[in-house]
Amino acid sequence: RGLVDVYKRQVTSLRSRGFSPEESAQIISLAQARTRARAKFGERARTLMLTQEAAEQATRPVTAHYRAQRLRPVAGTVADLGCGIASDSAVYAADRGAVVAVELDPLTASFAAKNLEFCPQARVYSGDVTDYVHGELLDAAGEPVGIVWMDPARRELRGTKKAQTERLFDPEAFSPPFSFVLNLARTGVPMGVKLGPGFPHEGIPLPEYIASEANPNPRVEAEWIQSEGSLAELVLWFNALAQEGVARTATSVHELPVEEADLDESPEEIPNESSNEDSKKTSALLPPYEAVSFRSPLTAAEAQQSVEVPVSLPQPGEYLLEPAPAIVRSHLVAEFAQSIGAHLLDEHLAYLCSAKPVEHPLVACYEVLEEIPLQEKQLKRWVREQGFTALTIKKRGVDIVPEQLRARLLGSAGSKTSKKKQKKNANSSSGAQEPTYRPATLVFTRIGSGRDSRRIGWHVRPL
């Protein structure tokens, strides 16, 4: 009710200043979208033209900056086909000094043009990207674009409101359809295509599938990118943008504080510094980052047939390893295990183990303290006897809901009020009480398959 009252007051205020009901609603919607977008775009969100749906679908600047670095080996202006509000286009414009953006919806195209005003060499067109023919789309200098970037729409409208959308999993229902993407790749144009990270491996084309007379040396690389630990996207790199001899890549991107940025970066690498304002916008669009990648020359199907890794279970004093989401989704678990000298727990399980601790940005390492009981009654007694008051529960391959199991195991000790008291007591400097806040991390999984499968659990310590 409080939000409704605020909305009514905002409408009344705008109406008193001469705005129509429709204009008032649009202004409020823009203000709300900008507020929500600040978590993704920072202070720049205050001046962006966007909708809530567009903000949700837009890429974080740090991920887009990483992609812009991937484009650098190829010369020419980037054509962003299906640019939306130009969140990607703006990063490419900041990095290269120019961009060509195409958007089907005229209103969204006008938003894109406004968001690209900082770049004099940016061009925005409203039209159907399927009408695009490589070589006919020109940049501000009258030259054909050199690179194509696409983010096919993977949502369709549901219900009466535009914001009510559902993701599509039929590639031919994308906008533009995936067949258009492949036909464009067959022209040989260097191209990057953003897809959802859940896109099936079997849907990723082999290089020979995009070979043609115009493209005699095709290349395809699939890269799963995670940002700040969360899986963000799959990018298919085609032709000159694909790394030679690489079929799959898992990448983790982490934004750095400004003070950790490379202060020796030459000014010419940051275009459009004609004014302090444009310079600030450019800096916000190109945040400093560090990226770590793991690559394989094999497709997932090829690796399944040829990569063999020993299987074993960790013993107390050894280490359980949890690969990063990008490693898991790219099906690079076995090859990654080989590279760090680890074993698989099971051929179908994304946990690893090692006799020694492993320090690597693409894996979380836990020391195995002990195996724990699996019967919930016994487990609850064990938790009580150990005096644990907070539990982190991790699982793979078992039908456990961590939040529900945690509540049952801890009982009243796991309530918010109890946790606050325990933390206050643990942080007390009076010395009158012993700390009572005792956290623990539990891991549950299933080994084997069918009748031979069994559940197993460990008490572990994060390193």
Where are these regions (language model features)?
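Conserved SAM-binding loop of SAM-dependent methyltransferases across substrates and taxa
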Residues: 85-97
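N-terminal, Lys/Arg-enriched amphipathic/low-complexity engagement segments
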Residues: 8-43
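Conserved class I S-adenosyl-L-methionine
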Residues: 75-84
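Class I SAM-dependent transferase core
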Residues: 32-73
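Short, small-residue-biased leader/transition segments that mark boundaries at the very start
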Residues: 2-7
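Conserved SAM-binding motif I beta-strand of class I
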Residues: 98-103
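S-adenosyl-L-methionine
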Residues: 104-144
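Class I S-adenosyl-L-methionine
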Residues: 1, 13, 149, 154-414, ...
